Amino acid sequence: MGYRDYKEFATGEYYHVFNRGNDKMDIFHDPQDYLNFLHRLCVLLGMPRGALGIGSELTDTKLRLRLDSFDAGTFSLVCYCIMPNHFHLLLGQNGDIPISKLILRLATSYSMYFNAKYAHVGHVFQDRFKAAHIANDKYLRHLSAYIHLNPKVAGLVKTTSDWKYSSYPDYIDKREDAVCDKSLVL
Protein backbone atom coordinates (compact mmCIF):
# COMPACT_ATOMS: atom_id res chain seq x y z
CA MET A 1 0.00 0.00 0.00
CA GLY A 2 1.35 3.39 -0.88
CA TYR A 3 1.52 6.09 1.73
CA ARG A 4 0.68 9.63 0.78
CA ASP A 5 -0.86 12.79 2.05
CA TYR A 6 -4.55 12.10 1.59
CA LYS A 7 -6.57 15.14 0.74
CA GLU A 8 -9.82 13.24 0.40
CA PHE A 9 -11.03 10.46 2.62
CA ALA A 10 -14.03 8.29 1.80
CA THR A 11 -16.95 7.43 4.03
CA GLY A 12 -16.92 3.78 5.10
CA GLU A 13 -13.19 3.38 4.46
CA TYR A 14 -10.26 2.76 6.82
CA TYR A 15 -6.84 4.41 6.92
CA HIS A 16 -3.49 3.96 8.62
CA VAL A 17 -2.60 7.45 9.86
CA PHE A 18 0.78 8.29 11.34
CA ASN A 19 3.19 11.11 12.01
CA ARG A 20 6.47 11.62 13.84
CA GLY A 21 8.31 14.34 15.67
CA ASN A 22 10.03 17.09 13.73
CA ASP A 23 13.62 16.09 12.99
CA LYS A 24 12.66 12.67 14.44
CA MET A 25 12.68 14.22 17.92
CA ASP A 26 10.85 12.53 20.78
CA ILE A 27 7.44 14.09 21.23
CA PHE A 28 6.36 11.95 24.18
CA HIS A 29 8.79 12.24 27.09
CA ASP A 30 6.87 10.99 30.10
CA PRO A 31 3.62 9.19 30.96
CA GLN A 32 1.76 12.52 31.15
CA ASP A 33 2.60 13.23 27.50
CA TYR A 34 1.31 9.85 26.31
CA LEU A 35 -1.84 10.13 28.43
CA ASN A 36 -2.45 13.70 27.31
CA PHE A 37 -2.29 12.69 23.64
CA LEU A 38 -4.60 9.72 24.21
CA HIS A 39 -7.01 11.83 26.25
CA ARG A 40 -7.18 14.38 23.44
CA LEU A 41 -7.83 11.61 20.93
CA CYS A 42 -10.64 10.15 23.07
CA VAL A 43 -12.25 13.57 23.55
CA LEU A 44 -12.11 14.30 19.82
CA LEU A 45 -13.65 10.91 19.04
CA GLY A 46 -16.59 11.80 21.27
CA MET A 47 -15.79 9.12 23.83
CA PRO A 48 -16.97 9.61 27.41
CA ARG A 49 -14.69 11.51 29.77
CA GLY A 50 -12.41 9.04 31.48
CA ALA A 51 -12.20 6.67 28.50
CA LEU A 52 -9.15 4.41 28.80
CA GLY A 53 -9.12 5.25 32.50
CA ILE A 54 -7.48 8.55 31.57
CA GLY A 55 -8.42 11.76 33.24
CA SER A 56 -7.76 11.04 36.86
CA GLU A 57 -4.15 10.25 35.92
CA LEU A 58 -3.60 13.61 34.25
CA THR A 59 -1.95 15.86 36.81
CA ASP A 60 -0.97 18.91 34.80
CA THR A 61 -3.91 21.24 35.39
CA LYS A 62 -2.12 24.25 33.87
CA LEU A 63 -2.34 22.67 30.44
CA ARG A 64 -6.11 22.37 30.22
CA LEU A 65 -7.85 20.68 27.39
CA ARG A 66 -9.89 22.95 25.13
CA LEU A 67 -11.34 20.78 22.39
CA ASP A 68 -14.68 20.42 20.70
CA SER A 69 -15.36 16.76 20.11
CA PHE A 70 -16.87 15.24 17.03
CA ASP A 71 -20.10 13.32 17.50
CA ALA A 72 -19.52 9.81 18.82
CA GLY A 73 -19.45 7.41 15.89
CA THR A 74 -18.13 9.94 13.37
CA PHE A 75 -14.88 7.95 13.30
CA SER A 76 -13.94 4.41 14.33
CA LEU A 77 -10.71 3.73 16.18
CA VAL A 78 -9.54 0.23 15.25
CA CYS A 79 -6.13 0.33 16.93
CA TYR A 80 -3.34 2.68 17.94
CA CYS A 81 0.20 2.81 19.26
CA ILE A 82 1.97 5.86 20.63
CA MET A 83 5.78 5.64 20.50
CA PRO A 84 8.36 8.10 21.86
CA ASN A 85 8.81 9.92 18.53
CA HIS A 86 5.71 8.97 16.50
CA PHE A 87 2.18 7.63 16.56
CA HIS A 88 0.09 5.16 14.56
CA LEU A 89 -3.70 5.24 14.32
CA LEU A 90 -5.91 2.88 12.34
CA LEU A 91 -9.11 4.87 11.79
CA GLY A 92 -12.38 4.49 9.96
CA GLN A 93 -14.38 7.37 8.57
CA ASN A 94 -18.09 6.81 9.20
CA GLY A 95 -19.53 10.06 7.88
CA ASP A 96 -18.83 13.07 5.72
CA ILE A 97 -16.31 14.72 8.07
CA PRO A 98 -12.85 13.74 6.78
CA ILE A 99 -10.24 12.12 8.99
CA SER A 100 -7.94 15.01 8.12
CA LYS A 101 -10.07 17.32 10.31
CA LEU A 102 -9.69 14.95 13.26
CA ILE A 103 -5.91 14.71 12.82
CA LEU A 104 -5.55 18.47 12.35
CA ARG A 105 -7.32 19.13 15.66
CA LEU A 106 -5.37 16.38 17.42
CA ALA A 107 -1.96 17.53 16.14
CA THR A 108 -2.66 21.22 16.76
CA SER A 109 -3.94 20.60 20.26
CA TYR A 110 -1.06 18.32 21.22
CA SER A 111 1.48 20.72 19.69
CA MET A 112 0.11 23.56 21.84
CA TYR A 113 0.39 21.34 24.93
CA PHE A 114 3.92 20.22 24.02
CA ASN A 115 5.17 23.72 23.23
CA ALA A 116 3.76 25.11 26.48
CA LYS A 117 5.08 22.28 28.65
CA TYR A 118 8.58 22.18 27.19
CA ALA A 119 8.96 25.86 26.18
CA HIS A 120 9.50 24.56 22.67
CA VAL A 121 9.27 26.89 19.69
CA GLY A 122 8.47 25.67 16.22
CA HIS A 123 6.98 22.58 14.68
CA VAL A 124 6.35 19.56 16.87
CA PHE A 125 5.46 17.22 14.02
CA GLN A 126 7.78 16.67 11.08
CA ASP A 127 5.26 17.27 8.35
CA ARG A 128 1.62 16.77 7.52
CA PHE A 129 0.44 13.39 8.69
CA LYS A 130 0.71 10.46 6.31
CA ALA A 131 -2.12 8.07 5.54
CA ALA A 132 -2.59 4.82 3.68
CA HIS A 133 -5.96 3.57 2.53
CA ILE A 134 -6.72 0.07 3.82
CA ALA A 135 -7.85 -1.76 0.71
CA ASN A 136 -8.86 -5.12 2.19
CA ASP A 137 -9.42 -7.08 5.41
CA LYS A 138 -6.16 -9.02 5.09
CA TYR A 139 -4.16 -5.79 5.01
CA LEU A 140 -6.19 -4.38 7.92
CA ARG A 141 -5.32 -7.41 10.10
CA HIS A 142 -1.65 -7.25 9.04
CA LEU A 143 -1.52 -3.55 9.84
CA SER A 144 -3.08 -4.08 13.27
CA ALA A 145 -0.32 -6.58 14.10
CA TYR A 146 2.35 -4.21 12.74
CA ILE A 147 1.03 -1.33 14.86
CA HIS A 148 0.83 -3.41 18.03
CA LEU A 149 4.30 -4.97 17.55
CA ASN A 150 5.99 -1.58 17.10
CA PRO A 151 7.24 -1.20 20.72
CA LYS A 152 8.60 -4.75 20.83
CA VAL A 153 10.38 -4.45 17.48
CA ALA A 154 11.87 -1.12 18.62
CA GLY A 155 13.24 -2.84 21.74
CA LEU A 156 11.20 -0.74 24.18
CA VAL A 157 9.56 -3.78 25.81
CA LYS A 158 10.09 -7.54 25.96
CA THR A 159 6.48 -8.40 25.25
CA THR A 160 3.85 -6.48 23.34
CA SER A 161 1.52 -6.47 26.34
CA ASP A 162 4.10 -4.51 28.39
CA TRP A 163 3.60 -1.32 26.34
CA LYS A 164 0.98 0.85 28.06
CA TYR A 165 0.36 3.23 25.19
CA SER A 166 -1.23 0.99 22.60
CA SER A 167 -4.58 -0.66 22.05
CA TYR A 168 -3.10 -4.14 22.44
CA PRO A 169 -4.64 -4.52 25.93
CA ASP A 170 -8.06 -3.96 24.30
CA TYR A 171 -7.42 -6.93 22.04
CA ILE A 172 -6.33 -9.33 24.78
CA ASP A 173 -9.16 -8.22 27.11
CA LYS A 174 -6.80 -6.67 29.67
CA ARG A 175 -8.54 -3.30 29.68
CA GLU A 176 -12.03 -2.90 31.11
CA ASP A 177 -12.79 0.30 29.24
CA ALA A 178 -11.74 -0.78 25.75
CA VAL A 179 -12.28 1.93 23.15
CA CYS A 180 -11.33 0.20 19.91
CA ASP A 181 -13.60 -1.45 17.38
CA LYS A 182 -12.07 -4.94 17.51
CA SER A 183 -14.72 -6.54 15.30
CA LEU A 184 -12.79 -5.79 12.11
CA VAL A 185 -9.61 -7.50 13.28
CA LEU A 186 -10.81 -10.46 15.36
Model-identified regions with their sequence ranges:
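Short catalytic/metal-binding and nucleic-acid-binding patches
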Residues: 1-179, 185-186
